[in-house]
Regions:
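Single conserved hydrophobic/aromatic residue that forms the stacking wall/gate
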Residues: 1-14
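Extracytoplasmic/periplasmic soluble domains downstream of a signal peptide or transmembrane helix
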Residues: 15-166
Length: 166
């Protein structure tokens, strides 16, 4: 499932965000690429909004299962995403799922805590197309933005979640 896909992949980052689109974490050519963070994000998920990219593979690998979050039943089964880092197991609660335009405000990098994060998260929550329960955000929250291709070069499917543990 999606949780296993994220857990298995190393989150990669390099100055060119497109580098890992068609390379493994060992930098070997591979059509599926790997799951990787935006090149401007900290590798430890320490930014207020960390953007994570992965291909929408038909075989379900990488972020191929992200499209399942277009169906309300998927969220009803589990509204959480877990990410394993070398230091901790992080649990995130999904608050928004939608199709975004490439280069839209969805891809705003927010480095540190503050009111800007709350405003951003509230705006992204309003884009949700599944009718998820509204939540309150805090200036210290950590958000992840999972982004994958849709088959349309102008859009991406996005699932956003806020860290709830630890």
């Amino acid at each position: 499932d999606l949780h296993k896909a994220i857990r298995r992949q190393r989150q990669m980052c390099i100055r060119d965000s497109d580098f890992y689109l068609h390379r493994t974490f060992e930098k070997q050519d591979n059509f599926a690429g790997t799951i990787f963070t935006d090149c401007q994000n900290k590798r430890n998920l320490g930014d207020s909004n960390t953007i994570i990219y992965g291909h929408n593979m038909k075989n379900g690998s990488m972020f191929g299962q992200l499209k399942q979050f277009k169906q309300p039943e998927t969220i009803q089964k589990s509204k959480y995403i877990w990410i394993l880092t070398p230091d901790e197991v992080c649990k995130y609660e999904i608050f928004s799922c939608y199709t975004a335009e490439v280069g839209s405000d969805t891809y705003t990098l927010i480095k540190g805590p503050g009111k800007g994060l709350v405003e951003y998260a509230e705006k992204m929550q309003a884009k949700d197309t599944l009718g998820l329960t509204r939540r309150e955000f805090d200036v210290k929250d950590k958000v992840i933005t999972l982004s994958t291709c849709t088959g349309n070069e102008a859009t991406r499917y996005v699932v956003q979640a806020v860290k709830v543990e630890p």
